[in-house]
Amino acid sequence: RKVIDTYNMEWREATRFYRQVKTAAYEPTHESKKFDFSFSDGKGRQLLLMYVVPILVGLKIVDISLYNQFVCGKSSKPLMDIYKDSDKGKWLATRLLNRNEAFEVEEGKSVVTVEQKIQQLYDAIFVTEYTGNVYHTILGEYEFDDNSKNFVKSVESMLSVYADYNI
């Protein structure tokens, strides 16, 4: 709903958006036993399915140039617009906190903001170049790697194992 409101989608666009998101990722985001998301990399994939794929679908419908900037690692604006000032964004950022981080001053922890955590999420998916020494990024209980970007793009295109055209 937040994507629809943020991008002022008309009825036709909103209907198309719901249909595409549902087709692309409904089953794995609704308590399916068919997919295992119990480890950190699986939790990362589940987070991508629930929080990033809908943004990609919405951007592709309303603003293809912003979509291209977003997936090429040039603009985190869509992710910020959706989550920065929302309760869902605060919840998401809390889950992305590492053990040594907090939103308020605590002994032995560095202070971070919701915006910083959302930016770190964006960077882990679309900006970080994973090489031999840097092969993954851990944010809280989630793991992202060099496949994360291709993963969200394939799910968004409805060409992944998660797509279900019978819904």
Predicted regions and their residues:
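Conserved AAA+ ATPase small/helical "lid" subdomain
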Residues: 1-34
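Charge-biased C-terminal accessory regions appended to nucleic-acid-, cytoskeletal NTPase
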Residues: 76-167
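Conserved C-terminal helix/linker of AAA+ ATPases
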Residues: 28-54
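Non-catalytic, well-ordered alpha-helical scaffold segments
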Residues: 11-15, 19, 46, 50, ...
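Charge-enriched interaction surfaces
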Residues: 41-48, 66-69, 73-75
